[in-house]
């Protein structure tokens, strides 16, 4: 925030890239992926691919409690999962804070913070692994079987998947991810991770350059929403995201030139 304020004082137009600068009115524009849509896509995938029946064990994990995007990702996921939690399709089994709020569709920032504080992975592979191990150790067989797991990104997804895949009482798991990391694409091909949300940084970069050019030309950049950064509503341009599964890895990532087929085995 301090750097943005210094730039603003010099008459510079400040464009936040991917991460929103919070707590200052020195931000003019924001270019980002639709973080809410990322979480909603993760949650919807779990709903669409959950085993039949009700009372399906649901394990919730989130990013860092210090990261504004982690809140938006989780909020997006909650927006689609909450009705299915409230009607008994899913049963939250690793967060009593989330259970206490399971009948509430719209959570306040404080309520989100309470849940995320309990299920945070800090965006760290080892933290996610330890938390998953602790959750499975604390739970009995009735909270295992065929389960669904909301993992916030690819690194944490792989860590959690590694833990769940070695528990003899977990017969299957559906798990989300985000970022289309090479290691997770291989996991998806191998059936160890269910999906990832692909955020094409080439498109994000192009959108940010277009915004900067508009500013330099004295024009008002194209925006499609606003994000509140705790000091103002910042005009923003959101870049679309793509759900990637084993079925569309080739078309989404190889044919588009993002990765090469030789980067993976089993394609």
Predicted features by range, described:
Residues 1-267:
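A residue-level marker of the well-folded mature domains of exported/periplasmic proteins
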